[in-house]
Regions:
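Formylglycine-dependent sulfatase
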Residues: 1-171
Length: 171
């Protein structure tokens, strides 16, 4: 049985529908940049995964939508620049990553709940403790901190209400 979505169906009928999408690059960062700019990676300067940052002069889809009254948000892996100038986050954040500071809020997004990189498909605050002899990881195994954090649109590290019955995050 199909799920009935009359509001989405009406919106799609009155809109431009894209039925095909081609990635701009074989890796994530340049493709993400192309999705939010509509431009080829060599035009905005991010050529490889987890390198570079969105330049301030680059116009994004979020900025265009804001001009037309939309509220914009980014949720999940950003991978288009660092999210903090102070804390060491993932593999590029912190004082060493200042030159690549380019969070979603500097690129037209009103709200965000984002990580600099590496959003796993399990608890995003944990990573498995593994050794080279193992070929899998069970979610019940021991974990350690993942090394990346969630950040909000004000540049604050999100630490509360991320998991369990008291979670206050709804997407």
């Amino acid at each position: 049985e199909d799920i009935q979505t009359p509001h989405l169906d009406a919106m799609a009928k009155a809109s431009l529908r894209f039925e095909r999408f081609y990635a701009a690059a074989p890796v994530c960062s340049p493709t993400r940049g192309s999705c939010i700019t509509g431009r080829h990676p060599f035009r905005y300067g991010i050529y490889f995964a987890n390198t570079g940052h969105m330049k301030p002069e680059e116009l994004t889809l979020a900025e265009l939508l804001k001009r037309h009254g939309y509220t914009t948000g980014h949720f999940g892996k950003w991978h288009l620049g660092t999210l903090t100038k102070t804390d060491k986050d993932a593999n590029r954040g912190g004082p060493q990553g200042k030159e690549h500071f380019s969070p979603p809020q500097a690129n037209g997004f009103d709200v965000c709940f984002s990580t600099e990189s590496k959003v796993p498909t399990w608890n995003p605050m944990d990573k498995p403790k593994v050794d080279a002899r193992r070929t899998w990881w069970d979610i019940s195994d021991d974990t350690e901190p993942y090394g990346t954090a969630y950040w909000d649109e004000k540049g604050r590290r999100v630490t509360k209400n991320l998991a369990g019955a008291n979670s206050r995050i709804i997407l």
